[in-house]
């Protein structure tokens, strides 16, 4: 059950329902998870800096159980997510940063319990 949180200073008009669907699909494929398990939030129009510049940029946080637990896995995930975002948003790769957070099953609640019991 991955969680993707994309924050950006790009305008909301770029983030259509179609973009969200395509990003969800790309992120699911990158992480090897089914699309119906993905959770995605896009927060556009923020005041942001990356590397001291307020030029168009994106920060992404990826939190997931058992798929973000090694540098090797995250390197692969990063490459696929960067490929999608650079093409879709016309950004250079130095204007995108990704944070990976490993979650444990007891840290994710669903259906009135936690994933440890589902």
Stretches with model-predicted labels:
Residues 1-118:
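Interaction-mediating elements
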């Amino acid at each position: 059950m991955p969680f993707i949180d994309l924050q950006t200073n790009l305008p909301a008009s770029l983030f259509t329902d179609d973009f969200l669907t395509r990003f969800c699909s790309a992120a699911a494929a990158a992480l090897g998870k089914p699309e119906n398990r993905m959770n995605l939030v896009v927060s556009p129009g923020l005041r942001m800096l990356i590397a001291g510049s307020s030029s168009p940029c994106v920060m992404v946080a990826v939190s997931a159980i058992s798929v973000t637990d090694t540098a090797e896995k995250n390197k692969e995930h990063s490459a696929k997510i960067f490929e999608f975002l650079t093409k879709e948003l016309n950004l250079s790769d130095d204007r995108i940063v990704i944070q990976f957070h490993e979650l444990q099953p007891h840290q994710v609640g669903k259906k009135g319990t936690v994933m440890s019991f589902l």
